[in-house]
Amino acid sequence: AVNRPDTIVLGMGLATLRAAKGNVCLETGNVQGLILAGLLFDAGEIKSDNLLVIGNEGQKSEDNGKNIYLSDLFFHVGGTDTDTPVSVKCCATINSNHVVGDNFWVWRADHGDNVAWEKNEAENGIIINGDDVTMYALMVEHFEQYQTVWNGDHGKVYMYQSEIPYDVPNQEVWMSHEGQKNGYASFYVDDAVDTFEAWGLGVYLYNRDASVELDTAMEVPDKNGVKVHNICTVMLTGYPGMNHIINESGDSVTFAGERKVICEYENGLIR
């Protein structure tokens, strides 16, 4: 645990932290001025709730003029040589306010040893609970529910890349909103959020193992102040398809190589 302000944790040669007993690999208190960089987090054979937790749950940090900086952080759920499947509930949870993230790759493995829907289980890639969190180059792939959940206000994302899981076995196990919607959007912004803005998003679909539908790539509350600029969806190959881009707006992608775009979205309107 890191509880002292202005601490720097720098991984030399991409230092790897692996959950051994269902534990969190690294967690911090609500302290400002932290810098974490150059770390790889691996899920373990005993399921953890998280691999990285920034800040205390339910206690957001005060604004003292110092951001927390998280750079070059990578997360693996499977994909390495192992005799036993690995799993985690969520790779990274950010509870603190005033966080800047740069270059996150959050990956549930789609190939390797003991990789399958009921083996390397992981619900979410990253959950943002803090306010004033900014992410640059956020890449989240193949998780079994929402790839990214954003609950904080005044969030900003510059470049987001995401692949929907390849290995969904059937539609019945992949339904959101208490079974009312097909699949889980890649990026989910909670209805309580009043201000959020994102630029340059790409969500990619490859239904490799079953014919299942994804209702929409991104869910946001339809409010003035919640804005999305330049988002595209692409069907890579496999079974179709993805029906919408944001909420119920945007055209579907249903054949290999098809790409659709929304340039500007706010409060239910495409501009």
Regions found by a protein language model. Name each.
Residues 1-271:
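Extracellular/periplasmic carbohydrate-active domains that bind, remodel
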